[in-house]
Amino acid sequence: MKVILTTRNRYLEYGLQALLKEHSVILAREFFLPENRRYIPDFDESWLIISDGLLGRLMRCMFQGRHFLQLDAELLRDDEQISDAIHNGVWTYNSAARPLTMSEMVVMFGYVYRQSRPCRLASEMGIHTKTVNTFLYTGMAKNGLYGVSVRRLVGA
């Protein structure tokens, strides 16, 4: 199981890292970088996603088709609550949905979290702007959201 932490609040991030000291925590802002776009996540890997309210929808969209449990970072109080959620929580696994590739995840995360424009993402990743737009479109299409802007993933 991999634990991924997604929040814009650095204080909350630091507190959650201290709370999860027995797990190896991956920070989403450091994981979804253009350098990591060639990484291939294992198909049977489980992900514990801890995100704030603003980025919850984005993370759910990015991990659709994978085995994951998503928790709201603002509602967590102690490590016992986290371990209870891991053992008794409802793990999401939609085998019918196609999982996003790492390149699609990197583009969607960069577009929403870092608020980078497609031309900036294209230059960082060494690809064309049309390819970035294709990644955004196919990422949304794999979630059944045809013709919907990626910016709609921000919010509760």
Name the predicted role of every residue range:
Residues M1-V90:
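N-terminal regulatory/sensing modules of transcriptional regulators
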Residues K21, S123, A141:
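Short polybasic/polar patches that bind polyanions
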Residues H23, H128, G139-M140:
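The DNA-recognition helices of helix-turn-helix-type DNA-binding domains
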Residues V90-N133:
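Helix-turn-helix DNA-binding segment
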Residues T134-T138:
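Residues within the DNA-recognition helix of helix-turn-helix
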Residues A141-A156:
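Basic, Lys/Arg-enriched C-terminal extension of HTH/homeodomain DNA-binding domains
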